[in-house]
């Protein structure tokens, strides 16, 4: 199976596998050799700050999804990862509602940052565990404290703010 030959972490999440299946079918139509297709896929780099896996170590995956500035854009990452420690917060989009149905079981705990912590707390408080961390530095420290309690359990550290972060950062790169 071609799936076993794909080693690119970015592309092996469920939605990307679907896209990959389409790309593979198109490559067959255009008679691209499988070896060339596999090489291209395994060297493909996704867009920075879009579900960017920037570190995998000791069963812990670190994902920067800082371009996710609404709940809908964050939901992709919540749906396709497990054992999530979710860092979120900032300036929410007007009318954005957090429907955690189908994703809450993937989240171990969330860490809320930014100036609008009450907004986020009210969106998630009866659905998932949370802690108000106020800023990214505190959130990272809080996540690592939780990881120490989990001792070698697989985990995903997800920075996917579900909002704009102009209250804390110059831009999504900062």
Kindly label every feature range from the protein language model.
Residues 9-107:
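Nucleotide phosphate-binding/pyrophosphate-handling subdomain across enzymes
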Residues 30, 132-133, 168:
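A structural signal for short, well-ordered beta-strand elements
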Residues 70, 135-139, 171:
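Alpha-helix N-cap recognition
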Residues 73, 119-120, 168:
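Phosphate- and divalent-cation-binding pockets in alpha/beta enzyme and binding domains
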Residues 97-155:
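C-terminal helical cap/extension that packs against the catalytic core
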Residues 157-162:
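Short beta-strands and strand-loop turn motifs
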Residues 166-173:
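Glycine/threonine-rich flexible loop motifs
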């Amino acid at each position: 199976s071609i799936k076993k030959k794909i080693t690119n972490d970015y592309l092996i999440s469920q939605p990307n596998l679907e896209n990959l299946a389409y790309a593979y079918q198109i490559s067959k139509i255009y008679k691209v050799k499988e070896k060339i297709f596999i090489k291209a896929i395994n060297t493909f780099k996704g867009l920075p700050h879009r579900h960017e896996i920037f570190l995998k170590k000791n069963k812990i995956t670190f994902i920067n999804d800082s371009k996710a500035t609404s709940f809908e854009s964050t939901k992709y990452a919540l749906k396709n990862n497990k054992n999530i420690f979710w860092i979120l917060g900032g300036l929410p989009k007007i009318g954005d509602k957090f429907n955690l149905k189908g994703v809450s079981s993937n989240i171990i705990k969330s860490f809320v940052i930014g100036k609008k912590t009450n907004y986020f707390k009210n969106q998630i408080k009866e659905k998932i565990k949370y802690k108000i961390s106020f800023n990214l530095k505190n959130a990272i420290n809080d996540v690592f404290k939780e990881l120490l309690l989990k001792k070698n359990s697989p985990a995903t550290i997800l920075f996917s703010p579900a909002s704009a972060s102009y209250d804390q950062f110059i831009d999504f790169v900062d």
